[in-house]
Amino acid sequence: NTRLPLKIKRGMSIAFIGNTLLDRSQDFGYLETLLHQAHPSHDLTIRNLAWSADALGLQPRPANFADTDQHLVFVKADIIFTAFGFNESFAGPSGLAKFRGDLANYIAATKAKAFNGKTGPRLVLLSPIANENVEGVNAAVNNTNIRLYTEAMRDVAAAQRVGFVD
């Protein structure tokens, strides 16, 4: 079970996985900085394993490249921040039931693995961010879908007892 705010112990390993939200965050380092700033003497290990376009059911990688679980074992993840839901939202309302099921299955399977060799990880789900309304794109259409997927994530997170940040 993961309760927010997180109680982070000295020496913990934190991993970021998921879509472009976290993939691009490695260009700026804000999340890592905030975690280190909040826990300056904790000697945390923080690794960004996110890839643009990742979705719950699709994580394309080059041939002979380890999968996400193998990387989580390598970094001995104690806490995992996940960013999913944005890419899945393009399926619209008709894809919502599948997304709920996939997310619940993903959380249950991930919690059952001891990437650190001792215990299952604590999970924090991050909601997808809104589409920017730029010229040539009607962001309002997908922002409606994103709201639906965000609420589904909130519900699944509560049922699975993992953290959720919107």
Model regions: which residues?
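Residue-level signal for pocket-adjacent positions within structured domains
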Residues: R3, F16, D166
